[in-house]
Amino acid sequence: MREISYNKDYVKLDGGFYFAQGVFETILIKEEAVFLEEHINRLNKSIDIMGLGEHIDIEFIKNFIKQEKLKNIVLKIVITEKNIVFSTRKIKYSKKDYKNGFKLKLSSVLRNPTSMMTYLKALSYNENLYEYNKANKEGFNEVVFLNIYGNIAEGATSNIFIIKDKKIYTPKISDGILPGVVRNWVIKNFRVCEKHLDKEDLYSADEVFITNSILGIMKIVQFEERSYSTSMVERIRSEYEQFII
């Protein structure tokens, strides 16, 4: 039986504390939790892969959200062998962010697609955070990781899409990316080609956007020194926002 903690300082000491042996999901809650089933399914798959014990029951999560009256907030669920930790935070992205768009920077760190950890939301997130924070200090909103073969993988906190000649492309999961929930929504609702992409594809793209569960869909206005138009991305984002109302 896991210890349940909500916005508390106390947890049981286990491999999650000593070795970052744990997984997490970050869920957007508006009037209701967005993509809750998809998040819990992915969480339980991660629990199996990491050998962390029993699954999380989606009804338990629904009841927790209802009991705590959570709305218009971000819920993070962390699972270790002995703990389930809930925490909440405000939704940090503003209308101004979506109006202005984001700027991307290439990271010098390479993703390893042969590592299973690449495909999980595991607690060992230091590399992502270090590169993300470094880019922020340099005036960028997100970084782009290539993998060891030179293909585009993902951002520190996001999946990446490019648009060329009105066609949408995104890296294959096998290039070393987290199979994002919003990424999957885009693939299901638009004609998207999953293929190997490299940094030259970013330079030659007409438009670029990134996705994650809290951000939703964010247009990219600049990669390094390359600027982009955003008209098609704006339409995709509009459809997504209508979907999650």
Region spans (language model):
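Helix-start/capping segments and mature chain N-termini
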Residues: 1-67, 80-245
